[in-house]
């Protein structure tokens, strides 16, 4: 059972270790969102 937990923990750790890689795509999405936000800045009411 402990082994299974360890494996699961390792799997969970894998994505955690990929955190530096995850923020990369997130940053890209944020950049796109930011771009949209800037464009929607005129439509702030709509964004709200």
From Swiss-Prot:
It holds the Pfam family SspP. Residues 1-12 have a biased composition (Basic and acidic residues). The keyword Hydrolase does not apply. It is found in: Spore core. GO terms for biological process: asexual sporulation; sporulation resulting in formation of a cellular spore. The keyword Disulfide bond does not apply. It comes from the Bacteria. Residues 1-48 are annotated as: Disordered. Induction: Expressed only in the forespore compartment of sporulating cells. Its main location: other. Keywords: Sporulation. Residues 31-48 have a biased composition (Basic residues). NCBIfam families: PRK09399.1 (NF006905). Belongs to the SspP family. This is Small, acid-soluble spore protein P. It comes from Geobacillus kaustophilus (strain HTA426). The gene is sspP.
